[in-house]
Amino acid sequence: MSANKIRCHDEVVVLTGKDKGKIGRVKFLCLSKKTVIVSGINVVKKHQKPVPNKNQPGGIIEKEAFIHLSNVAIFNAALNKADRVGFKIKNGKKIRIFKSNGNLIK
């Protein structure tokens, strides 16, 4: 299995949709569905019923929804734009690099 190009806590930029161009940090990554949750991006309103057992009030809450991996790209802070991810073998370990300038992704 190949390594993931986007991982948790990476800074990504949204390529399509209502939040196009916005930058955020990956909070959750679902590999089986190939989707991510990015903090502050793709915020939707959810109508929630009250749950008296858990002392949870009902109402309209805002939460981040999933975005498909194809709609986000890793953000290169050195160039201040979206970039692609490449891999190199260094000291027997596979590391991620930015394709445009070859810098290591932290």
Swiss-Prot record:
InterPro entries xrefs: Rib_uL2_dom2, Ribosomal_uL24, Ribosomal_uL24_KOW, Translation_prot_SH3-like_sf
Keyword terms: Ribonucleoprotein, Ribosomal protein, RNA-binding, rRNA-binding
A Pfam entry, by short name: ribosomal_L24
Single GO term (MF): structural constituent of ribosome
One GO BP annotation of this record: translation
GO cellular component terms, A-Z: cytosol; ribonucleoprotein complex; ribosome
HAMAP family reported for this sequence: Ribosomal_uL24_B
Function: One of two assembly initiator proteins, it binds directly to the 5'-end of the 23S rRNA, where it nucleates assembly of the 50S subunit.
Subunit structure: Part of the 50S ribosomal subunit.
Family the UniProt entry places it in: Belongs to the universal ribosomal protein uL24 family.
Protein's name according to its UniProt entry: Large ribosomal subunit protein uL24
Gene: rplX
